[in-house]
Amino acid sequence: MEISFRQTSLKDAERELFFLQSLESENINGFQMKIPKNMKEFEKLLNKFIKDSENPDSGRVPQKVYWVEINEKIIGIVKIREILNENLKKIGGNIGYLVGKDYRNKGYGKKILKDALALFRNHKYIIITCNESNIPSQKVIKDNGGKLIETNNGHCVYKINL
């Protein structure tokens, strides 16, 4: 199962928007993102992703957004935050990931998180969270070495030692 991460850029906006709009009718279960309705809204979101990767607004931390692909087909999204503020220590963590509905329950979530962890080779550990109701995500996190350290207002907070 060969996946690749491609950082956000404006060049593949049409494919990326199509993927996000395929998620609109479902609960994206804690992956905090408003689904754009059209290309104008999406370009605004992409520009925010690009800005947030280098120069986030006050109170926010740098965050890189990657599209997860297999053979140039988007199957998910990963958000990477190398540093955390107090809020992200409770909800969000260092890594956020989303697997498209057609690719769930096939091992992609586990592989996506494993590959995302490799981006943190200079860290001793990462924090990752998910909704208490998201049992599949809890399994993915545990399968990648996650240890539950607390629950907080419906969110599970895990630590993964690297």
Language model features with spans:
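Short coil/turn motifs at secondary-structure junctions
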Residues: I83-N85, D102, S133
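Conserved active-site alpha-helix within GNAT-family acetyltransferase domains
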Residues: S133-E150
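GNAT-family acyltransferases
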Residues: M1-N94, N153-L162
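Conserved GNAT acetyl-CoA-binding A-motif
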Residues: F120-N131
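Hydrophobic residues in beta-strands and at strand termini
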Residues: V99, C130, I160-L162
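Conserved acetyl-CoA-binding loop-helix of GNAT-fold acetyltransferases
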Residues: G96-V99, N105-L119, Q138-D143
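Short aromatic/hydrophobic contact patches that present stacked aromatics
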Residues: S4, G96, I127-T129
